[in-house]
């Protein structure tokens, strides 16, 4: 089983002072990749890319308004799609190439055995489970990854005047990282600002090294830096990141 991004954490309350790190540090690229069919485009022209489909089978309790989750997914997947020639991403309601879900430690054995695990994913491997991603919903997901007052999360455990802060995790950063694995990238240890760096760094945009690696697998889309920056800033502005 190809599991990634097992996060070390000894505090079940996920104290904001604990450093999180990803444990699988291989840097070679995976031997398999997505090869979706390139169907006809408008007016019968041949598209030079294919769609990798995805769906969310179980949503996060931290985003009761699914629009936040939808935006996070769109930002993460579109950033990869803007940089690749061969693939785009499309959300579906039925059978999908990549299935994403949120589960807590009561529902997922790995999260019970390793309570500090933030998420795990499978490489594309030609099998049904290839590309699937599971996020630990026992941790606190937010739009910005900043510490949050404990009373806001656990009003039954903390008093309104508590000064206790709990660590939260940026949903877009984690989606970007896990989606990188789901489309074939392993960790990068050389550049600490990379999305695929093996330590959680909260970055919400692709580093040039991330781009070079994914384009070595799926080709370069060829959009100008100005256009890419425009779409990226527009997406992040709507998200609030």
Where are these regions (language model features)?
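Zinc-dependent metalloendopeptidases
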Residues: 1-241
